[in-house]
């Protein structure tokens, strides 16, 4: 493992830069770059700080997120280190760019940990660039004194693409963004790769898969720090580290990296940003509730009360939620790069049809193999190749039947068999519309 500084000049695109291609980076544990000078300046001055942990289910675990907050608090016992849990399992930087204002910026953090390399692993390079650069520019546009730290995790399935000693593709794309904006990065998986290759660690310690990507099931501990065969068990599923093994290794990487990061950079606002690496990055996002005057709805629907059993658990992610039954139709117009709905999928999920500018609709099923429970998701409502053109979006909730039992994973089918009534309804639940651009009245 090594700590080294990047030689690429901030604000300058790499030679031959192509946003649709990936140049895989050497596997290095940390690049301090511009450091976290504003964050550390507040700590050294004895001022309270707030850290936002922004990512997917690995960040949602009681792992490196909890360990690092505790570490900072122990290092600076005379200040209050506050933490914002802004992680949602099974989601990537695309939803991250949309929900940034509600889940992170309104708390005015001093530091944002950004962890999306695993959940962005299947996203094309241009998609990662649009959302991750949008996150960076949105943070600094609203909070110029907030520092940002990219952290990378890994999974068993990503190890083959990290041969011989390169970062996985998603992290490599994020490194280019970090270079351009002088953002420090920590790859928390370097030691894990070394231990696995030397036969001292097993990535997947059980044949059991995860049935949920949220909630208490994520927070598991290994029975032993070392298995009977002498190997460290990293995770049950090869993805979500055990709290007392994999996440400890992640935290050790953070500890090793922080001294050089602390020494880097100069205090001051992240102002006068260079032009975007990609012109259509998702920097300017607006959030529109479904009862907005410019959103037209017909058919059966309601604004759910805050004690609704399905939507209540998600009120920390949106101000309100709405439910639409079969026959409901939603129409709105927008101008910009794209639009999406912040929806909930689960046992009651039905089938919706989405039409753009009156074209043949595409089908979006609000149910998947995990859906023994309800969880947040994002429903794509289309891109626009011309951000100045007004687009009309129509969402129809159909009564099309779904063979939900057939869709569920085999280990989830018993839940259907015991509770068939739980799956009978066909509904569409959503909290708001995200637009990279603006809504048109």
Report the location of each language-model feature:
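The substrate-binding groove and active-site-proximal loops of carbohydrate-active enzymes
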Residues: 89, 117-127, 158-165, 240, ...
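A short helix->loop->beta-strand "cap" motif at the edges of active sites that frequently abuts
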Residues: 141-149
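A short beta-strand-loop structural module common to alpha/beta enzyme folds
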Residues: 79-91
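Charged helix-capping and loop-helix junction motifs
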Residues: 127-134, 167-171
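Substrate-gating cap/lid alpha-helix
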Residues: 156-191, 197-199
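Oxyanion-hole/transition-state-stabilizing segment in secreted/luminal serine hydrolases
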Residues: 44, 52, 64-66, 93-129
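Solvent-exposed loop/turn segments at secondary-structure junctions
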Residues: 57-60, 88-93, 118-123, 146, ...
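N-terminal secretory targeting modules
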Residues: 1-54, 59, 65, 73-79, ...
């Amino acid at each position: 493992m090594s700590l080294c500084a990047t030689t690429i000049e901030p604000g300058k695109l790499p030679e031959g830069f192509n946003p649709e291609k990936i140049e895989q980076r050497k596997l290095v544990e940390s690049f301090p770059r511009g450091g976290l000078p504003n964050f550390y300046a507040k700590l050294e001055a004895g001022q309270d700080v707030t850290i936002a942990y922004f990512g997917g289910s690995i960040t949602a675990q009681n792992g490196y997120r909890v360990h690092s907050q505790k570490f900072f608090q122990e290092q600076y016992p005379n200040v209050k280190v506050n933490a914002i849990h802004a992680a949602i399992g099974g989601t990537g930087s695309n939803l991250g760019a949309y929900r940034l204002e509600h889940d992170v910026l309104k708390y005015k953090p001093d530091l944002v940990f950004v962890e999306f390399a695993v959940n962005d692993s299947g996203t094309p390079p241009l998609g990662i660039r649009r959302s991750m650069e949008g996150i960076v520019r949105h943070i600094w546009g609203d909070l110029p004194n907030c520092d940002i730290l990219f952290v990378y995790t890994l999974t068993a399935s990503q190890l083959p693409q990290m041969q011989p000693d390169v970062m996985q593709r998603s992290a490599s794309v994020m490194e280019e963004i970090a270079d351009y904006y002088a953002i420090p990065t920590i790859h928390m998986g370097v030691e894990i790769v070394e231990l696995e290759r030397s036969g001292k660690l097993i990535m997947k310690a059980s044949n059991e898969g995860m049935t949920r990507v949220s909630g208490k099931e994520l927070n598991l501990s290994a029975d032993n720090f070392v298995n009977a065969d002498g190997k460290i068990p990293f995770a049950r599923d090869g993805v979500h580290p055990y709290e007392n093994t994999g996440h400890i290794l992640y935290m050790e990487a953070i500890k090793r990296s922080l001294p050089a990061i602390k020494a880097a950079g100069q205090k001051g606002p992240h102002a006068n940003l260079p032009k975007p690496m990609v012109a259509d990055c998702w920097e300017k996002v607006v959030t529109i509730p479904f009862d907005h005057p410019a959103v037209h709805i017909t058919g059966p629907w309601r604004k759910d009360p805050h004690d609704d059993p399905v939507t209540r658990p998600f009120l920390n992610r949106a101000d309100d939620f709405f439910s639409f039954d079969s026959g409901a139709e939603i129409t709105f117009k927008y101008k910009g790069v794209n639009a999406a709905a912040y929806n909930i999928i689960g046992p009651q999920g039905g089938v919706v049809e989405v039409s753009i500018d009156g074209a043949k609709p595409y089908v979006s099923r609000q149910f998947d193999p995990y859906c023994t429970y309800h969880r947040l998701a994002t429903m794509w409502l289309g891109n626009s190749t011309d951000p100045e053109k007004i687009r009309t979006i129509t969402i129809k909730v159909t009564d099309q039947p779904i063979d939900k039992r057939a869709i569920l994973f085999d280990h989830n089918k018993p839940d259907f068999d015991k509770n068939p009534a739980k799956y009978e309804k066909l509904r569409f639940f959503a909290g708001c519309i995200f637009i990279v651009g603006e809504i048109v009245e």
